[in-house]
């Protein structure tokens, strides 16, 4: 019958003759002479077999019956193979689907972890921004308070300096220079409790220049002197002029400040 894996429509003449011989019919030569192929078997009729020289009606019926039985067996076999192949394809498709589902599940888990991480980082960022915002607002309040206090201090210092001075008078003690004498009264100094006696030499000098509308940037062109006992005295730059002024007042010296323009 030839290769058992081949179906009858693929048989050559030799395979057909071998199949007839295996059935036990003495008609192999007739099938050889007419060169019957597998694709011809399905078309044979009783008259065709008679024309091929098979006179026995019983043999013709048996051959046709064997052909139908063989066709049914191979058809069932083909259907089973198709079912097996379909089942195999379904199993492979299901396996691929499971793999894709597992992959998507892993991706979903990974995505959830990323979302959770981003939510955590976002929460941290919001807390950090809120903290920075709070610190920034506190800093702005401190700056506003410092600016306000600085303005008050400037006003108080100007008021203190003003309370210690009288209108500027020319000083005849320094010839060839532009001098300003600043008198102070003991009573006004004692009454003014806001007086800042810790101002440095340069601070007092610049304050005096500002008060009399002289550019403070020209302070190097002026000296701050103090007059007592009818004599002008130089004030060392490391001495705090207002403290010196107070000390002289306490000793009853009646001191006064003098602005003296240096000679070129």
From Swiss-Prot:
Keywords: Meiosis, Stress response
Organism (species): Schizosaccharomyces pombe (strain 972 / ATCC 24843)
An example Gene Ontology CC term for this record: cytosol
Region (Leucine-zipper): 111-139
Domain called SAM: residue spans: 11-73
Pfam family, one: SAM_2
UniProt cross-references to SMART domains, sorted A to Z: RA, SAM
Keyword Protein biosynthesis: no
Known role: Essential for mating and meiosis.
Name listed for the protein in its UniProt record: Sexual differentiation protein ste4
Residues annotated as transmembrane: none
Source species taxonomy: Eukaryota, Fungi, Dikarya, Ascomycota, Taphrinomycotina
Keyword Methyltransferase: no
Domain Ras-associating: 176-264
GO MF annotations, alphabetized: protein serine/threonine kinase activator activity
Gene3D superfamilies documented for this protein: Transcription Factor, Ets-1 (1.10.150.50)
GO terms classed as biological process: meiotic cell cycle; pheromone response MAPK cascade; signal transduction
Induction, as annotated: By nitrogen starvation.
Assembly description: Homodimer or heterodimer with another leucine-zipper protein.
